From Swiss-Prot:
Signal sequence extent: none
Keyword Lipid biosynthesis annotated: no
Free-text description of this protein's post-translational modifications in UniProt: Contains an active site 4-methylidene-imidazol-5-one (MIO), which is formed autocatalytically by cyclization and dehydration of residues Ala-Ser-Gly.
Main location: cytoplasm
Reactions catalysed according to its record: L-phenylalanine = (E)-cinnamate + NH4(+)
Name of the protein in its database record: Phenylalanine ammonia-lyase
Family the UniProt entry places it in: Belongs to the PAL/histidase family.
Organism listed in the record: Rhodotorula mucilaginosa (Yeast)
Gene Ontology BP term (one): L-phenylalanine catabolic process
Amino acid sequence: MAPSVDSIATSVANSLSNGLHAAAAANGGDVHKKTAGAGSLLPTTETTQLDIVERILADAGATDQIKLDGYTLTLGDVVGAARRGRSVKVADSPHIREKIDASVEFLRTQLDNSVYGVTTGFGGSADTRTEDAISLQKALLEHQLCGVLPTSMDGFALGRGLENSLPLEVVRGAMTIRVNSLTRGHSAVRIVVLEALTNFLNHGITPIVPLRGTISASGDLSPLSYIAASITGHPDSKVHVDGKIMSAQEAIALKGLQPVVLGPKEGLGLVNGTAVSASMATLALTDAHVLSLLAQALTALTVEAMVGHAGSFHPFLHDVTRPHPTQIEVARNIRTLLEGSKYAVHHETEVKVKDDEGILRQDRYPLRCSPQWLGPLVSDMIHAHAVLSLEAGQSTTDNPLIDLENKMTHHGGAFMASSVGNTMEKTRLAVALMGKVSFTQLTEMLNAGMNRALPSCLAAEDPSLSYHCKGLDIAAAAYTSELGHLANPVSTHVQPAEMGNQAINSLALISARRTAEANDVLSLLLATHLYCVLQAVDLRAMEFEHTKAFEPMVTELLKQHFGALATAEVEDKVRKSIYKRLQQNNSYDLEQRWHDTFSVATGAVVEALAGQEVSLASLNAWKVACAEKAIALTRSVRDSFWAAPSSSSPALKYLSPRTRVLYSFVREEVGVKARRGDVYLGKQEVTIGTNVSRIYEAIKSGCIAPVLVKMMA
């Protein structure tokens, strides 16, 4: 059973300070003196992705109420409200309430003037005029409530209803962001309307909102209209509450609330913003941050499984010669994860050319170049985090906007969600490229010709009857191909809309949805990678345990059969021949592999003892004895490994102290063990797919995030 996200995240929260509110306090307690670009509230060039994930976990897992003031909402707060049900309220600040009331009063004085969306029509119909400002808001909602949802409760009861609706967490996040934006007092939306939204959130009432139908140009008009209609008690609005779907009217009555009547501009103020796109983007980016940390952890584990070189992550290569900040960050993370590993090569000894023949001098690109590959992706995600922090926490997205200081109404394009859409394009590409490096690391590890003597397909028994990870190899290719397709831009598909008025638009919600979909596919791929790499480090542990007994055995048999002729130099040549052959015949079954290995090694003995009197009989006797003893030894080591309790797995003593944390999490808490094989055991166990599914669920639920933070902190 995976640990509770809340229990782990709370411990992280207790160790971190709330930087936003501390910054506000440092400004005399008045956050409203800050500008929208208040740098102290946002990621800086010194901020690492690990810092960001720690902060998100802390804010999301906090137990205090989120106070919305238009300036200090963090992305972690949005995650907390959306996924953890953190309660929210409009901050108890006289300044906020005064500003909101003043904007409402200023608008009242402008009702005789031509104000867009208050006395005029909407969009391309802004050439119409009306004096009935209240009815105009109803007309706005009427034409925007045009999405496709089930026509009866039976559709929801049969599980068909939510396939065309936004995830409930996205709607909750959108409501939180919209209230936060409206507290800034630029939209003339009354406190009572904002409190209607927070009451819905705090009573667990979530509007059912269509998945599609917005181009995120003049905000997310249609999705936000469904939210606005719900708080007015629209008779055809559906909501989710207490695990049930019911009408908004029923939910309002059930929870003892009151519907609101929208005043002038309040319908427009509710729907003319980017909150839905920003909410989906925030959740997608949060997941992408965690997947990035997991990709780095998997790189470290793959280095261990492949007996790779820690030197690829040396500070000289990154901090000194090519000091891109996020490349340095990724290299440092992987280097830190490898500290203390008995698998990874930490100190390379210079060797002569003749002693190095046939040996791969350095790791292949997927491991060696991973900081250079992942670093720029991390940079894009950190930038996306800064953009979304501004969008969700410190921005007014509406039109027109009220400028109280200058007593003006500004008509502009503050609703355009291109900033959100652009971050999602870059994030989704980063997600696809993370998948690419994971796929290449994984397939190298599964390939018997590339994986430094690991068994073919990571089979724990004879490869002729165990193809363990072969299906996963194919599945990983499918996931990677799909990621490549999803990486294509959405923004290039903009179409002119709404009488040509919205001739350019952002498609931000579509892009955010595609990014969330890409995250899901990457989660499948990384779950597959994690399953395989843990099997690989277990098999490598068996190899290391075998080597401890195997090398003395080779020494003993050389001396037993060749006496004083078996010098250290002869032994060294024979040993090199053996290990070279073991990297070439790892797709053979056990008995065939050892007989083949010592047939080849016999040639090394002949070469090493050239000029000495050695009979063919003694050579053959040595070859047969070595093969038989090696076969028996391998079987003994295997049986000991599988008989041992999982908590005493040999891999634990070879892994680094930090990668050991992730290994133990999967093996013990998620409950996915190393696999020996159905054919060998003579019975069918839990399928490979079920075990990968368990890891996938640990990723998707968020349980793995605190584990990754613990590893890297």
